[in-house]
C-alpha cells in the first residue's frame, strides 16, 4: 500500500499547481539548460573556414556545372550569373571558360520547358563574343531546328528568337553550313503551316493568320525572322547589285577569256573552299549539302521552296492587319532575290552569246600540233 500511494502521489504532482512564496525563487524544470557560460568561438561541424575566397573562374566553372540541375530556379540563376560575369569582364579579356567548353552545356537549354530559363539563355547568347560564335554554327543549328519543330508553341517561338540572334551574328555561316539552308527552310514551312509539294495536295493546307493581339505575336516574329533568313541566303548583295546594270555598258560580259573568270583563279576567300566536295565526310543528301554560293542557294530555293513561300506570303497579305505588314518584309526580300536572279541569268546568256559570236572557246586556246 505504501508504494502504490507513493506512485499515485507522484502522478498527481504533475497536475497540481505549485504554490509560490514571496522572496523564494521559482523551481527550475527538469529539462533546464545552463546558458550562463561564455565562449570566445563557436565551432560547427562540417564547416570549412578558409582565408581565401573562391576566384571568379572557380565560381564561373561551378555555375556552368549547375546548368544541368533539375531545379528550374537554379538553372535560371546560374545563367544570370554567367551572363553578368561575361558582360562585366574587362574589354578584350578572354572568357573564364572557352565557348567550346560552355556551349555543349548551353545547347540543351534551348529546349528547356521553363520560359525563364530560355529567356535568360538568350541573354547569355547575346553576351558571348560574336567572333567565337561563328565557328560553332553547325553545333547550334540542330538544336534550333529541333526547337522550331517542338510540340510546345512557346519553345518554338524561343527557338525562332535564337535563330534571329544567330543570323544577326553569323548570317553567312548559317545559310552556308551543312544542312543550314534546306533543313531550316523546311522548319519555317512547318512552323508557318506552309506546306511543300507533298502536302499541297490537301485542300486545307492554308495557314490561318487571323489572330490579333498577343496570340498573333508569335506568327509575326516567325515572319520577321523568315525575312532575315531569306535576306542572308538569297538577298541581293549590295556590292554586286551594280553588276547586273553593267550588262549593256561593257561590263564583265564584254571581257574576253580569261579576264571574265579572274575570280575563279584567285586565292579563295573561305577557309575551306573545297568543303562542299565532302571528300572525307559521310555521304550527304541534298538537304545536308553545303550551299556556299548565292547561285547554289537560289537554284535550290527556286526549285523547292519558291512557290510554297510565295503562296504563303500571299495568304498572309490577304489576311491584312499586323500579319500583312509583317509579311511585307519577306515579300520585299523575295522580289529582290528573284529580280537579281533574273539579272544573273540574263548576264550568263549574254556572256555565252558573245563567246559564241567571237568563236573563242577553251579549245581555241589549247596549243595546236
Curated annotation (Swiss-Prot):
A GO term from the CC aspect: rixosome complex
Basic residues bias (residue ranges): 1-10
Keywords noted in UniProt: Nucleus, Ribosome biogenesis, rRNA processing
Superkingdom in the source lineage: Eukaryota
Assembly information from the UniProt record: Component of the RIX1 complex, composed of ipi1, rix1/ipi2 and ipi3 in a 1:2:2 stoichiometry. The complex interacts (via rix1) with mdn1 (via its hexameric AAA ATPase ring) and the pre-60S ribosome particles.
PANTHER family per UniProt: REGULATOR OF MICROTUBULE DYNAMICS PROTEIN, TESTIS-EXPRESSED PROTEIN 10
Name the UniProt record assigns to this protein: Pre-rRNA-processing protein ipi1
Organism encoding this protein: Aspergillus oryzae (strain ATCC 42149 / RIB 40)
Lineage: Eukaryota, Fungi, Dikarya, Ascomycota, Pezizomycotina
Amino acid at each position: 500500500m505504501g508504494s502504490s500511494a507513493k506512485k499515485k502521489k507522484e502522478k498527481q504532482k504533475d497536475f497540481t499547481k505549485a504554490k509560490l512564496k514571496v522572496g523564494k525563487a521559482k523551481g527550475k524544470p527538469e529539462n533546464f539548460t545552463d546558458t550562463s557560460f561564455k565562449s570566445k568561438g563557436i565551432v560547427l561541424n562540417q564547416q570549412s573556414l578558409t582565408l581565401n575566397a573562391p576566384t571568379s573562374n572557380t565560381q564561373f566553372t561551378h555555375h556552368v556545372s549547375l546548368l544541368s540541375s533539375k531545379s528550374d530556379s537554379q538553372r535560371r540563376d546560374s545563367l544570370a550569373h554567367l551572363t553578368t560575369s561575361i558582360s562585366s569582364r574587362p574589354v578584350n579579356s578572354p572568357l573564364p571558360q572557352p565557348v567550346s567548353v560552355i556551349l555543349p552545356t548551353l545547347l540543351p537549354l534551348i529546349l528547356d520547358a521553363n520560359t525563364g530559363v530560355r529567356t535568360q539563355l538568350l541573354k547569355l547568347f547575346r553576351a558571348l563574343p560574336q567572333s567565337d560564335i561563328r565557328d560553332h554554327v553547325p553545333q547550334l543549328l540542330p538544336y534550333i531546328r529541333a526547337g522550331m519543330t517542338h510540340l510546345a508553341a512557346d519553345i518554338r517561338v524561343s527557338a525562332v528568337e535564337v535563330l534571329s540572334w544567330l543570323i544577326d551574328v553569323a548570317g553567312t555561316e548559317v545559310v552556308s553550313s551543312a544542312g543550314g539552308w534546306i533543313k531550316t527552310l523546311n522548319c519555317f514551312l512547318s512552323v508557318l503551316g506552309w506546306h511543300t509539294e507533298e502536302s499541297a495536295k490537301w485542300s486545307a493546307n492554308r495557314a490561318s493568320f487571323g489572330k490579333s493581339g498577343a496570340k498573333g505575336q508569335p506568327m509575326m516574329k516567325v515572319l520577321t525572322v523568315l525575312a532575315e533568313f531569306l535576306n542572308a541566303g538569297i538577298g541581293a548583295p549590295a556590292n554586286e547589285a551594280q553588276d547586273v546594270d553593267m550588262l549593256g555598258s561593257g561590263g564583265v560580259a564584254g571581257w574576253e577569256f580569261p579576264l571574265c573568270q579572274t575570280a575563279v583563279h584567285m586565292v579563295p576567300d573561305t577557309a575551306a573552299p573545297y568543303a562542299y566536295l565532302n571528300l572525307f565526310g559521310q555521304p550527304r543528301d541534298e538537304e545536308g549539302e553545303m550551299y556556299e554560293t548565292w547561285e547554289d542557294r537560289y537554284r535550290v530555293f527556286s526549285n523547292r521552296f519558291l512557290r510554297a513561300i510565295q503562296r504563303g506570303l500571299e495568304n498572309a497579305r490577304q489576311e491584312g492587319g499586323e500579319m500583312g505588314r509583317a509579311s511585307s518584309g519577306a515579300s520585299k526580300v523575295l522580289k529582290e532575290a528573284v529580280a537579281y536572279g533574273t539579272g544573273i541569268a540574263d548576264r550568263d546568256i549574254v556572256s555565252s552569246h558573245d563567246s559564241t559570236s567571237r568563236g573563242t572557246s577553251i579549245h581555241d586556246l589549247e596549243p595546236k600540233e
